[in-house]
Regions:
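NAD(P)+-binding Rossmann beta1-loop-alpha1 motif at the extreme N-terminus of oxidoreductases
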Residues: 1-46, 183
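A short helix-to-beta-strand connector/capping loop
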Residues: 47-62, 138-141, 187
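Rossmann-like NAD(P)-binding element
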Residues: 55-101, 108-115
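General beta-strand structural signal in soluble alpha/beta enzymes
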Residues: 63, 103-104, 141-145, 189-192
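Glycine-rich beta-alpha junction loops
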Residues: 84, 106-109, 149-150, 170, ...
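Short beta-strand and adjoining strand-loop segment in the mid-core
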Residues: 115-125, 156-172
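Rossmann-fold dehydrogenase core element
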Residues: 122-146
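Active-site-lining helix/loop region of Rossmann-like oxidoreductase modules
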Residues: 162-233
């Protein structure tokens, strides 16, 4: 499975890239600047393979300009701030094609327009994920996920104590992304229903940021009380 991470040089994108590369997935770091993407990929290879004494393999972890990164990927993960989401989707749209899955991790925080990171903006389409779906070519499945994962926890060794809520109108695509989420140690994946439910999941992120600011922590979300099969473990 090849995964292009758009915004892969940022904290969230690089953290997801690190975890999936450790799980043996082929990861392509996307950036506006190909050189920056290549440098980020080199650092990631050193983290993943250096400590274990395994030679770096460019074919497993590589870097490319965002549009180029999308062209050969089965799954495209968008990890850019809300203010950059629409522009980025318009940029990569020509490189997206039917059969791909676009995973949107965007949270419409008020900080994107100079407001507080503990508040969300209203999105005309209902959610950032629904806005992404509107800007995505026909035949590309849009899945909303990974909104509530702390970027800091992704970069720390050890399991991530957090559940990932996955929302999509395409059940098969959602199932694939839940399986991908489970490759991160400690993470459970929960079916969040249709894409419109992403609005609720996105709002939770602002609440978690508030917890983190007040407590100087890295809070996550756990869904309890469901039967074991609901967590896709």
């Amino acid at each position: 499975m090849s995964i292009a991470i758009i915004g892969g040089t940022g904290p969230e994108g690089s953290g997801l890239a690190l975890r999936w590369a450790q799980a043996g997935e082929t990861v392509i770091i996307g950036s506006r600047d190909p050189q920056r993407a290549a440098e980020a990929a080199a650092k990631l290879r050193e983290k993943v393979y250096g400590a274990a004494g395994v030679p770096a393999r460019d074919t497993i972890i590589s870097g490319a300009e965002n549009k180029s990164a999308c062209e050969s990927a089965e799954i495209v993960v968008l990890t850019v701030p809300f203010e950059a989401q629409a522009e980025m989707l318009k940029h990569i749209k020509p490189a997206l094609h039917p059969g791909q899955i676009l995973v949107d991790t965007t949270v419409p925080l008020a900080a994107s327009v100079g407001g507080r990171s503990t508040r969300n903006l209203g999105v005309w389409q209902g959610s950032a994920a629904q806005q992404a779906a509107e800007l995505t070519p026909e035949g590309v499945s849009v899945v909303a996920a990974f909104h509530n994962l702390s970027a800091e926890l992704l970069h720390i060794e050890g399991p991530v104590d957090c559940d990932v809520i996955v929302c999509s109108d395409d059940k098969a695509a959602a199932q694939r992304i839940r399986a991908l989420a489970r490759k991160i140690p400690g993470v459970r994946a929960v079916d969040g229903g249709k894409l419109e439910n992403a609005r609720i999941v996105e709002q939770i992120t602002a609440l978690l940021i508030g917890f983190n600011i007040r407590s100087k922590g890295h809070s996550g979300l756990r869904i309890t009380g469901l039967p074991p099969e609901a967590y896709d473990v």
